[in-house]
Amino acid sequence: MAERTLVGLALKVGPLGEHDRLLSLLSDAEGVTRLAVPGARRPKSSLAAAAPLTLLELQVGGRSGLARVRQLRVLHSHAGLGRQLETLSAAQAFCDLCLQIGREDPVEGLLATLQLHLERLDQRSDCLDELLASSVQGAIHLLTLGGYSLPLQSCCLSGAPLEPPIGTWEWRCSLLPMDGFAIDRQPGAAMTLNPSELALLQRLTRADLPRRRDGELMGPRPVWLRLLAVVEIWIRTHLQRGNPALAMLRECVTAKQVSQHGADAANS
């Protein structure tokens, strides 16, 4: 295999034998590539910087089998996301998604989109609701790039436009996991959404989070948890397995919500 230079983000790093590491790298050139990093588990190895959530420039080669990293340079690290379990869970969820959707062939824009959403997680780490919303939106953007977009524009049964009538609170649409969203309550639905929930979900395909005129995030935390559930169901159905990191994020947010309610009750 020819010597080459790769620039990409470390999605996953695990042990390989006694002294080496196995690196899963996302790059524009090759999509997801598995590489051996020789000696990276040794304390003073020059290749020990091959860590998850790190943007790397690698010199790679090898005559046959698993390609090996010859040299390594760290271009940027998202290690700060590990300071909180919530941001770490969201970042891990993004990486796991990229491992699934970028494995076959390179996906144009996937690396840049992943880095953008990792930066947003870091910027919004101080506000739990913003972090949760960014996690839902980031997952939707990555799914769309990978060809697994949520069909949010038309009813999967009738083909009629999905136009949520804001203010008509008895209206519902149903999530049919294999097919998409259908108007009205439908048998076999995994969950139903009201008009404001669907409208909020539809806006997540845009570049920025939905905000009110005063700049505040639209939607309360329980609604964002419901939209997270939509994403979890879609991933589990169409990628053949769930995303444990998203489940961990849900647990973290729910636990903080319960803790906050307890504190509010004690102070009242």
From Swiss-Prot:
> GO terms for CC?
bacterial nucleoid
List, alphabetically, the Pfam families matched: RecO_C (PF02565), RecO_N (PF11967)
Q: Name one GO biological process term.
A: double-strand break repair
What keywords does the record list, in alphabetical order? DNA damage, DNA recombination, DNA repair
Q: Which domain of life is it from?
A: Bacteria
Q: Which InterPro entries match?
A: ARFGAP/RecO, DNA_rep/recomb_RecO_N, NA-bd_OB-fold, RecO
Q: Which HAMAP family match?
A: RecO
Describe the task this protein carries out. Involved in DNA repair and RecF pathway recombination.
Family stated for the protein in its record: Belongs to the RecO family.
What PANTHER family does the record tag this protein with?
A: DNA REPAIR PROTEIN RECO
Its protein name is: DNA repair protein RecO
Which species is listed as the source?
Parasynechococcus marenigrum (strain WH8102)
Organism lineage string: Bacteria, Bacillati, Cyanobacteriota, Cyanophyceae, Synechococcales
Gene for this chain: recO
